[in-house]
Amino acid sequence: SVSSWKEAAELFSDAKNEFAKSVSKLANISADIADALDLKSEAETLRGEAKNLSSKGDAMGSSDLDTISENSSATNALIDEKLKAAEVLSDDQKASLGKAAVDYVPLMISTIGVAMKVKDTVSGVTSLGSPGFSDGRAAISAAREIPSLGPNMIRFTADSTKTGVSLLNLMNTKGVSTPDTSDLDSQLGDLMS
């Protein structure tokens, strides 16, 4: 539970910083997958967005999240299309995709953990009322940002997890060795409850 706006601001700032780093790493993994499937320009775009998001840290805002979300969705749709159309993947492609899958699962689990902290902060501030001048500028800023950016972060995490699990399952049908995703499914259930 959150006891003050000052605490909420600190928790949210830390969560945004962690989230920006995690999402940046996830975007780089998606770029690696795109690369393995010869989607070079899409991979380059995602890497640029990942670098931008990583540099933002706790200054990340909704527009940054929207941009990387749009680019990730477009690239993931192309990845999905390429995988479905592929009759056979080369051994190099299978190795690259398998490595990406192995990197993806634990990173997504930690991203869900960050989203859980965000969810706790979002629900914790509902009982705090409005911050006052004595709470400080960071608290006043957090009071404006938490109700909008917090749910966007949670939604992005849920959508990314569902897309990722779907892509891993598709990779598996193409002979790529992928890790078990049951932990992701159960953590996603916790996040959405």
Question: Whereabouts are the PLM-identified features?
Answer:
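Immediate post-signal-peptide N-terminus of mature secreted/exported proteins
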Residues: 1-62, 185-193
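Extended amphipathic alpha-helical interaction segments
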Residues: 63-191
